[in-house]
UniProtKB/Swiss-Prot annotation:
Domain bZIP: 322-385
Stretches with biased composition (Low complexity): 86-109, 680-693
Protein topology in the membrane: Single-pass type II membrane protein
Biased composition (Basic residues): 519-529
Name of this chain's protein: Cyclic AMP-dependent transcription factor ATF-6 beta
Amino acid sequence: MAELMLLSEIADPTRFFTDNLLSPEDWDSTLYSGLDEVAEEQAQLFRCVEQDVPFDSSSLDVGMDVSPPEPPWDPLPIFPDLQVKSEPSSPCSSSSLSSESSHLSTEPPSQVPGVGEVLHVKMESLAPPLCLLGDDPASPFETVQITVGSASDDLSDIQTKLEPASPSSSVHSEASLLSADSPSQPFIGEEVLEVKTESPSPPGCLLWDVPASSLGAVQISMGPSPDSSSGKAPATRKPPLQPKPVVLTTVPVPPRAGPTSAAVLLQPLVQQPAVSPVVLIQGAIRVQPEGPAPAAPRPERKSIVPAPMPGNSCPPEVDAKLLKRQQRMIKNRESACQSRRKKKEYLQGLEARLQAVLADNQQLRRENAALRRRLEALLAENSGLKLGSGNRKVVCIMVFLLFIAFNFGPVSISEPPPAPMSPRMSREEPRPQRHLLGFSEPGPAHGMEPLREAAQSPGEQQPSSAGRPSFRNLTAFPGGAKELLLRDLDQLFLSSDCRHFNRTESLRLADELSGWVQRHQRGRRKIPHRAQERQKSQLRKKSPPVKPVPTQPPGPPERDPVGQLQLYRHPGRSQPEFLDAIDRREDTFYVVSFRRDHLLLPAISHNKTSRPKMSLVMPAMAPNETVSGRGPPGDYEEMMQIECEVMDTRVIHIKTSTVPPSLRKQPSPSPGNTTGGPLPGSAASPAHQASQPLYLNHP
């Protein structure tokens, strides 16, 4: 059974969209399952309805000029004098055809179509009862053959032959028309027509599946008279056709048990009871004479569609399942169309957003490139400005360093040139140099010689008695002055351990100590001269004693038990040995004393986070000099107080032979010496005792 489709749902244009193009996978495989058997017939019928072309053009002769097709239900103007009326009989009985044939044969000659008349062929079939929807039962097709012959005496017989239709469901009709221009020169012609007959649908039917009925081939042959078989030359004009009386012979055709075809008739034709159906002939007719007649065009097959007849069958009831299934299919198609439309709109929206984002990205990239270029320009300008300021800073720093180097460096312009050194000293490694601050009690003149020689020729070597080189103090005296000066005060405070002190304060302290040492040296040089002058004045005042004359001659002089020969000792030999014994350092002030009359005071408290402190209080000026100006020298004592931090304490051993003779002389002890050590000699004056230093330190 063919699938059922409602015309109202198919014809509604609002239920489908232009983009509703389903692929073969979207359709159900069973949609056309019922149409497999009648695919060929259905295609033929639907093609004729849609294209409005009733006949197949493939069967036409391409050598002929074919006129454009016309509607199949319009009368053809080719043969206006020919009207075929056919009444096919039922396949069950042939009585109707026999009666019709007898009726046609008994008609008077006046009713036989002649020249200018129309031949009527009537084909009737039982009309089915009226129905709304359903199937039309199969009705057999037959082949009708009509032979019309013209003669001078009587009418030609018209034979009707029914033959089974071909499987292609097409009715072929061949008509042979034999005519002559005159009774003596008849015109012979032959026409082959293709006739397609359909049973009309009853009025009131909307849509149904009509089974393919058995179509027949109608062949109409019009032959010449027997006396015209000799074949004379055709005349110049076409004679009118005078057919013989029609004799119909029917041949029953059994019904065909083949596949049925479905036909859809949108507008049925109403059958008039008084008017017989008209056979429609469309297309050119080729007429070919027989015998020696001139050549004529080849016959052409044309399709004849008879008027539809009412049917006798009623379609069964509509299947509800198929209807629901068809509705579901339509809904599925609609939903698929909507989903595709939504997907398309979504993709279009995504494309629009993508284009907008790409445009924004390009704009941001351009802005980023512009900002980078501006940043590079600003960085280049900033680097140029920094480079200029850096150059100025470098120049200022270099000028400051040069100023320091020329004023306080080793090549300072204010520093005197160093004393020349002997080649032997230049070859040897430099040893640490030290400044010695000391004093000695007044004694013979030879006690001051070592200091004077050291002051006059500093840095020179003096060979000892054993042949070893002896080293002197390398402290230089500028301008040959006989006072102890520092070589360079700036170099004494440039060491790493003194950088945390105030430089100005350090220089001030160094100047104070240097002045104190110089005043002490000048005082030691003045005291011996005054003592010698006093002794000379006392000797002048005393008269020499009178010696008595001995009674006996003097004998040989007595010798000292010490020895006959006294070796000469260089007065400055012990000075370098003494400096080496105390391990003198050039950046340190030394106070050396061999007397034990100093006062020692211990510290009451001590800070464990700092070094022990020590204060030295010693005479600052000579006995007859004053600095403060507070009064006569006898009222006040000028003392120098030195604040120190104890760095280290140790015990050293000095040979007695290395001690200078001026410091080695020990006076007789006095009862007031509580320390038990040697005290200064009694020959020393009180002023000289007052000039001795006083050591104050904690134990």
